């Protein structure tokens, strides 16, 4: 049986190809800009991770989507409809916070049951008076007419205020008043744009749905307990559970209300390594099984690479790159992203001609053709893409340090004063002369990142 929220949301949907879109979103706290012109579009059923260091703005984006914060400017669209004026409980989202926010006085079952109190199911069509639908169509026309009149009134007021602001004789107080109204006009328009849809939802909820029964509640709880692996813990108190089990309860409580979008704010950060790995696998399994959109916040690069369909890498309130894990890891847009997303060797490079780059004094073949001759670039080669041997290669160097990592060795090679890191299965003694080389496509060239960064950014 379908959740009524899923049924009602159909009335909101347009033909947008994206489930969620943020368009030109700014967020300010006083004079401090937290988000700067953020544009992000997420498809239905995607697992998207917002990845960035502390203070980058990733959690703010999540809170804007969930309705816990308001944008300063810009649009937040669900299926093409601007919903930034909607309160959290009216959005098709459920949120798992970093501390899980579980009810300590309730059992596992009690926590999962909590969200079901407001859940409603569609009534049996045969029990509904056909006149209800005629009445709904009549009211829709009335609501549409009313909303249009309000929109026209807003247009007129906006035009009037914009004209007034052009006057040079306007006092400072009045100028601020009119400008403040214009700055907030986005929210005023958004309210009336969604007015009809909201009225229809209220009508349908009252006339076309019913409360969920006790048996249905128990059925939903049993299904969810099985889904997240909580069998045998139904009656336990929250204080009796491990971190991993608490996380499962939080997942069950969020998923039982059948949201279209699950928002996860660093939910695994407090778990130890083994439990964290198990929960990562569970998240992937659940997302594929139920098929809803997951938006996951983390500062852990490995976690983002393992979980995501796509990753938005965020820096100082801006999205630096939004792409698949493979594209971001292999083809980062700049040095900052490359350094943040994994181990890397960087080189100062000059593009000398088509398919050639000057690196450490040598002309090295490259697959790149898009840069201008003489252009200064950043070069990237991942440690695992470098071959080390005793046979002649691109550069000769000396092994300075070797670290055993279990399944491989991490070796530091000194090449004319430049330390190059290499991952290899072969052992080389410290002080040994070696040669390093790499495949043609291992060298990735990027335009210089003039913004720069400090080591403590990571």
From Swiss-Prot:
Its main location: membrane. Keywords: ATP-binding, Cell membrane, Membrane, Nucleotide-binding, Translocase, Transport. GO terms for cellular component: ATP-binding cassette (ABC) transporter complex. Disulfide bonds: none annotated. InterPro entries: AAA+_ATPase, ABC_SmlMolc_Importer, ABC_transporter-like_ATP-bd, ABC_transporter-like_CS, Mo/tungstate-bd_C_term_dom, P-loop_NTPase, Transp-assoc_OB_typ2. Residues 120-210 are annotated as: Insert. Residues 20-341 form the ABC transporter domain. It is found in: Cell membrane. It is a peripheral membrane protein. Its EC number is 7.6.2.11. Pfam families: ABC_tran, TOBE_2. GO terms for molecular function: ABC-type polyamine transporter activity; ATP binding; ATP hydrolysis activity. PANTHER family: SPERMIDINE/PUTRESCINE IMPORT ATP-BINDING PROTEIN POTA (PTHR42781), SPERMIDINE_PUTRESCINE IMPORT ATP-BINDING PROTEIN POTA (PTHR42781:SF4). Part of the ABC transporter complex PotABCD involved in spermidine/putrescine import. Responsible for energy coupling to the transport system. This is Spermidine/putrescine import ATP-binding protein PotA. It comes from Mycoplasmopsis pulmonis (strain UAB CTIP).
């Amino acid at each position: 049986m379908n959740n009524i929220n899923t049924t009602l949301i159909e009335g909101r949907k347009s033909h947008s190809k994206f489930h969620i879109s943020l368009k030109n979103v700014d967020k300010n706290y006083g004079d401090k800009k937290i988000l700067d012109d953020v544009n992000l579009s997420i498809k239905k059923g995607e697992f998207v991770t917002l990845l960035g260091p502390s203070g980058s703005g990733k959690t703010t984006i999540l809170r804007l989507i969930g309705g816990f914060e308001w944008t300063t400017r810009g649009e937040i669209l669900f299926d093409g409809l601007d919903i930034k004026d909607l309160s959290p409980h009216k959005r098709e989202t459920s949120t798992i916070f970093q501390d899980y926010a579980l009810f300590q006085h309730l059992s596992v079952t009690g926590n999962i049951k909590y969200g079901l109190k407001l859940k409603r199911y569609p009534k049996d069509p045969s029990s509904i008076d056909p006149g209800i639908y005629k009445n709904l169509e009549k009211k829709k026309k009335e609501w549409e007419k009313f909303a249009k009149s309000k929109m026209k009134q807003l247009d007129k007021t906006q035009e009037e205020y914009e004209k007034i602001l052009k006057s040079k004789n306007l006092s400072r107080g009045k100028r601020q008043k009119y400008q403040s109204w214009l700055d907030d006009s986005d929210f005023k328009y958004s309210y009336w744009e969604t007015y009809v849809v909201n009225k229809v939802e209220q009508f349908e909820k009252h006339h076309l749905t019913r409360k969920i029964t006790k048996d249905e509640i128990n059925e939903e709880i049993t299904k969810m307990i099985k889904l997240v692996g909580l069998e045998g813990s139904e009656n336990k108190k929250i204080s009796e559970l491990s971190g991993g089990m608490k996380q499962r309860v939080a997942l069950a409580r969020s998923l039982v209300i059948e949201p279209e979008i699950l928002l996860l704010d660093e939910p695994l950060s407090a778990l130890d390594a083994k439990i964290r790995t198990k929960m990562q696998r569970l998240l992937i399994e659940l997302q594929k099984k139920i098929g809803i959109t997951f938006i996951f916040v983390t500062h852990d690069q490995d976690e983002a690479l393992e979980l995501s369909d796509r990753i938005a890498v965020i820096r100082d309130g801006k999205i630096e790159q939004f792409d698949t894990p493979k594209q971001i890891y292999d083809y980062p847009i700049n040095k900052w992203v490359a350094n943040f997303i994994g181990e890397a060797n960087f080189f100062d490079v000059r593009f000398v001609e088509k398919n050639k780059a000057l690196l450490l004094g040598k002309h090295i073949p490259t697959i790149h053709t898009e840069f201008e001759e003489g252009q200064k670039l950043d070069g990237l080669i991942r440690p695992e893409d470098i071959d080390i041997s005793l046979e002649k290669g691109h550069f000769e160097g000396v092994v300075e340090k070797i670290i055993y990592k279990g399944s491989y060795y991490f070796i530091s090679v000194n090449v004319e004063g430049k330390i190059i890191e290499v991952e290899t299965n072969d052992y080389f003694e410290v002080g040994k002369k070696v040669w390093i080389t790499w495949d043609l496509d291992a060298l990735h060239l990027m335009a210089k990142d003039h913004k720069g960064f400090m080591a403590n950014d990571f």
